[in-house]
């Protein structure tokens, strides 16, 4: 079951060492049959996806080294969750502190801040960081739809800004020169442009039987596959 701020790791899921790519350490690995593939844009949406970026940022640093960059538009960045998850596997507090320092956080509060950061500032940060011995290998954007409101912006402007963000995240994912391996984004409500530009899209929802389920909405070979979480 997916709770408010995290996905609960499930027993019986294959270990990360038996998979390839960036894993979730929960049943989403079973849905995909593997982890997130390199140089892909993965999109997760639904009311119950809160917490995914925290876990992916943690697992990226833990399994692939380097750094993770968390763009928090949904106010869901949870260092305590990350600390708890890392401590479950690493009792060494020094190692945990080092891991936490490897996850950079940028908070945005408006749709224009998010658009400007993703389209202008983030590419510049990634370009500079690509020269580092510990480059950013994961970029995650949480709660993208949370900073958009039709009360503040006309629908046409919202559509245009979301399209620009989706295009740029897709470009970042495909650009091997920036040394970013994985890009993921979440929203509570479905954003059509993110769906169009993503390589993998997963909807997490509550079924009529009051159970949490995940469905592959976009995938090159497994589209339509569903599991109970």
Give the location of each predicted region:
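The Walker A/P-loop phosphate-binding site
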Residues: 1-91, 95
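Short, well-ordered alpha-helix to beta-strand connector turns
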Residues: 39, 65, 100, 177, ...
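Residue-level preference for the first positions of well-ordered beta-strands
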Residues: 39-43, 67, 136-140, 179-181
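Hydrophobic/aromatic beta-strand patches that form the interior of the parallel beta-sheet core
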Residues: 42-44, 69-71, 104-106, 181-183, ...
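Catalytic-core regions built around general acid/base machinery
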Residues: 56-60, 164-175
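Conserved inter-motif catalytic segment of the P-loop NTP-binding fold
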Residues: 69-150
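Well-ordered, non-membrane alpha-helical segments in soluble/globular domains
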Residues: 117-122, 155-169
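Phosphate-binding/switch region of NTP-binding enzymes
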Residues: 170-229
């Amino acid at each position: 079951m997916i709770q408010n701020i995290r996905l609960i790791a499930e027993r019986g899921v294959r270990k990360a060492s038996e998979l390839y790519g960036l894993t979730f350490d929960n049943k989403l690995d079973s849905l995909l049959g593997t982890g997130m593939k390199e140089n892909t844009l993965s999109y997760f949406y639904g009311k119950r996806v809160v917490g995914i970026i925290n876990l992916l940022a943690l697992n990226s640093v833990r399994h692939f080294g380097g750094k993770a960059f968390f763009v928090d538009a949904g106010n869901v960045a949870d260092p305590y969750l990350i600390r708890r998850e890392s401590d479950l596997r690493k009792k060494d507090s020094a190692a945990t502190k080092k891991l936490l320092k490897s996850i950079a956080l940028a908070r945005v509060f408006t749709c224009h801040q998010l658009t400007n950061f993703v389209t202008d500032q983030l590419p510049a940060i990634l370009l500079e960081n690509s020269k580092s011995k510990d480059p950013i290998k994961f970029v995650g954007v949480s709660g993208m739809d949370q900073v958009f409101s039709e009360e503040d912006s006309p629908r046409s402007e919202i559509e245009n800004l979301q399209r620009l963000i989706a295009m740029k995240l897709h470009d970042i994912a495909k650009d091997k020169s920036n040394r970013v391996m994985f890009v993921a984004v979440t929203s509570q409500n479905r954003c059509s442009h993110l769906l169009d530009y993503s390589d993998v899209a997963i909807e997490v929802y509550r079924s009529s039987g009051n159970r949490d389920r995940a469905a592959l909405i976009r995938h090159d070979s497994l589209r339509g596959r569903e599991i109970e979480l």
